[in-house]
Amino acid sequence: MIKKENLDKTSAWPFVEAKKLLRERKSFIEKKGKITLQTGYGPSGLPHIGTFGEVARTTMMVNALKQLSDFPTEIITFSDDMDGLRKVPDNVPNQELLKENLHKSLTQVPDPFEKFSSFGEHNNEMLKKFLDSFKFNYNFQSSTTLYKSGFFNPTLKIILENYEGIMNIIIPTLGKERQQTYSPFLPICPETGHVLEIPVIEIDKEKSNIIFDNKGKKLETSILDGNCKLQWKVDWAMRWYALDIDFEMYGKDLIESAILSTKIINLLGKKNPSGFAYELFLDEKGEKISKSKGNGITIDQWLEYASPESLSLYMYQNPKRAKKLYKEIVPKAVDEYLDCIEKSKKQNELQLLMNPVWHVHNGNIPEEEMIMTFSMLLNLVETSNADNKDLLWKFVKKYKLDISETNFPIFDALVGYAIKYFNDVIKAQKKYKTPNESEKKALEALVKTLEKCTDEMSPEDIQTLIYSTGKENGYADNLRDWFKLIYEVVFGDENGPRMGFFISFFGVKETTELLMNKLK
């Protein structure tokens, strides 16, 4: 049990947001006896890493809430699968099939992968599959199911009752042209199945019907049982109302929507949920990651190169700062995860609550000793030419005699990830430097220094000798350039490992031969 004084003191963001939620929603939570958090998913494209981030962060909030409160918690993962398909995603097959079904609800669009009854169902199943793989606890809800089953009917009637008030909230935020055509209700065309964005001529609150102008023809339809869906901002407010949501986080691009949805739920007679706006996920070019574009790194790619926990840690850090998500950030993210595990071993309870791995592992932090960084392991893959785990483990065991794959499961997984990442990402990017005459002379002096070293020497002693060699060969004023030269010649990169440690690990003789081969 965590001490109350430490729970009061911690400034870790999941605890800060959980305390804010309990403050703002106290009476509502006490009345219903549980805390309901929501995450949203638009299944117009495949689930991407940003989708994972929202569920992971909300789960961290739940973990904090469990320390602060005895109320049961629930995460609703809501899929907007009744939305119309507005454009064909770039990263799916059967593009023509999707073109033919534009503007239909996603659960009425055929599955281009030919596995499920609709494109919406396919993407929902992909979402559930990947959330399950991370062992998230969530309650999946489908917009189509809740509309068509009548679950939303009582709230839809309240929205129709407040039609004029809702229009007064939304209309001032629209351009003049859009003001003429806007309607909070989008009927599903009985002939084409399209989600129609057409103006309302008349509403019948008693019958729960609306009359539209459909290309000069009057169309009367019920707003109930899935015959209509709501425009986004009104739909979001309805969801909060009908599902009694206490908390939802959202990207900063939805801040304006959240303000309007808040006004709408307040108009309907309920208090809005507690909210949290996070910064967006960007690709390497700084562009927003999009489900339909498939840009940035995918979840599957990350999991080929690193553990789910390293991804969770990346999501934990600085949620209010924009994050670039692409392949090259993986090693740094993995090393930060390993470093946080190491730090946790010497931390007191309050410090642990501030450590990201406490939130990643919900307090059950692994106790495994971290043998080396992922970056170092990548250098070892390159220099050893190891193309399988067994071969790489041989090098590791030469340095650490008392370790085995079974006793070091995190490191064993890292070995596999390092081989895959090096071959897929790093290999093609390597640019090895050809040293000029003076640089070659300095590196030949380093070879002579290494020939005098032994494997019994400490990494610190070897590092000192490398420093001395650099100073004696023209790098006394800039040792940074000396190490940069070594890295560019040996590793094909401007940065590299601490050389004393690397040589101790890889072997003095092996490193000497490696350097000699590079100088040929």
PLM-predicted stretches and their roles:
Residues T39-Y41, T77-S79, F134, S142-T144, ...:
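Glycine-rich, histidine-containing beta strand-loop boundary motifs that form or position
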Residues M82-K99, T155-L160, K288, K293:
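Charged, often glycine-rich, active-site loop that binds/positions anionic groups
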Residues E96-F130, F134:
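A glycine-rich helix N-cap at a beta->alpha junction
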Residues F136-I299:
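Active-site cores that bind ATP or allylic diphosphates and position pyrophosphate for catalysis
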